[in-house]
Amino acid sequence: MVNLKIFLIVIVLMFNNIILAKENSNALKVVDQEENEFTAINSAPLKISEAARYSFADIVEPLIPAVVNISTIEYVNDKSENSEKDLLQENKHLGFMSDVLEKLNIPLNLEEIAKTPKSIPLGSGFIIAPNGLIVTNYHVIANVEKINIKLADNTEFLAKLIGSDSKTDLALLKIDSEEPLPFVEFGDSNDARVGDWVIAIGNPFGNLGGTVTSGIISSKGRDIDVDTDNIVDNFIQTDAAINNGNSGGPMFNLDQKVIGVNTAIFSPLGTNIGIGFAIPSNTAKPIIERLKKDGKVSRGRLGVTIQDLTEEISEVLGFKGTNGVLVSKVQENGPGYKAGIKKGDIIIKFGDRLVKNTKKLRVIIADTPINQEVKLKILRDAQELELPIKVTADNEEVINDSTEETNKAVIINKKENNLSITKNNITFSNLTEELRKKYDIPQDKTGIVIINIDEEESVFKLGDLITNINHDSIDDIRKLEVLYENAKKLEKQNILLLIERGDTSVFIPLSVS
């Protein structure tokens, strides 16, 4: 009986396998019939090129020769007075050789070895013209005296710097070759879409030149705040592997066009985790053209010092939200001064473009032709004003970022002589000749000064000169206390101090709650 049950189970399993095999066979036939087509949900069949479906080899092969490794040359004996020690430390095998050769009475000439140039990898780049013009990142070649270029065939050249632009992190180099060089062309990054395939070629970790990786465009228009100096706010994000050393290398689309300059990665560990960023070609190309023509990029300015709004600052000024930028200083006889901009004004619109923060304003100004007149919309004492202003060529606006929140308990400790007062662990004093000399405060400056900070971390600094509180000028600490107590009675959270620190000014909120 048991044997009969086992027999029946085997028969059922065999029958099921036959059915499954038949279904799989039918499925394979469907795939064969579809050939190079697939159907997306709710879409028509899409064609996929044979080359891209099975391999990127045909796409990549002609591109690799146009991608270069960038390095600099360093000599050990240029590094320090302890050249011999440094040399043995960096090349531990020399220590072993020295011992062996010493036993054989053969001298090891470390001085000659130290004269041997050592290549220090910097990053990647790509050739954009047969005459040897090369695009890379500014941060790759910044502060480097000798720039060495190695081609895919290991041919090496010394490059000269044609021009650079730290604001967009781009640089243009040139090498001189007797033969025309392979090159690549920029494509239109505006045509690229999220989900498109992209290919990155570069020199990761400085010794893996010609490395090819692929991925898709994960997002566009990313503002990643690479640093406060950078004005690019529309990075392309990709999951193609980008590592240290890939900086300055090209990002290609499947049409073999450069649609981005690989620039940065997001990684807590400093290695690729699938989040890389590239400067779009439509941002890079006009900058490169200006570097080719002039060797630099000139931009306009307003002649004001600006800072981002915070909730604390907005609350004091009676402004809703944090969109806009706060003017903390106006350069005398500058464009802003001539237009009538004042300290404490909030810039909310530049022409027909809304101003979200300091970086956005800098980007807008960078896009504005020099000497063009625009309408600037500002808020002053809760009223909107429109001021015409002409953008002139010079350095960019000074940005202040010392607007961190300060929420310390308030301690009032007025001294008997009424020369100083302590609030939030910060001691303020009337400005005396002794303090003016100690903190190098010019004679034409008035205000109260910070003489002590009783906390480890503070946005304030010793010697900070407070010239205004809210909209009022101040030159006596008694006024600080009056304004402070009035703010508490009105149930305000902060008062706003205008600090002069060296050549710049910044608004910093002081908590009263």
From Swiss-Prot:
Q: Which GO terms describe its cellular component?
A: outer membrane-bounded periplasmic space
InterPro entries assigned to the protein according to its UniProt record, in alphabetical order:
PDZ (IPR001478), PDZ_sf (IPR036034), Pept_S1C_Do (IPR011782), Peptidase_S1_PA (IPR009003), Peptidase_S1C (IPR001940)
What domain of life does the native source organism fall in? Bacteria
Which processes are annotated in GO (biological process)? Answer: proteolysis
The region called Serine protease is annotated at 124-289
Q: Which PROSITE patterns match?
A: PDZ
Q: Which reaction does it catalyse?
A: Acts on substrates that are at least partially unfolded. The cleavage site P1 residue is normally between a pair of hydrophobic residues, such as Val-|-Val
Q: Which Pfam families match?
A: PDZ_2, Trypsin_2
Q: What is this protein called?
A: Probable periplasmic serine endoprotease DegP-like
The organism is Rickettsia prowazekii (strain Madrid E)
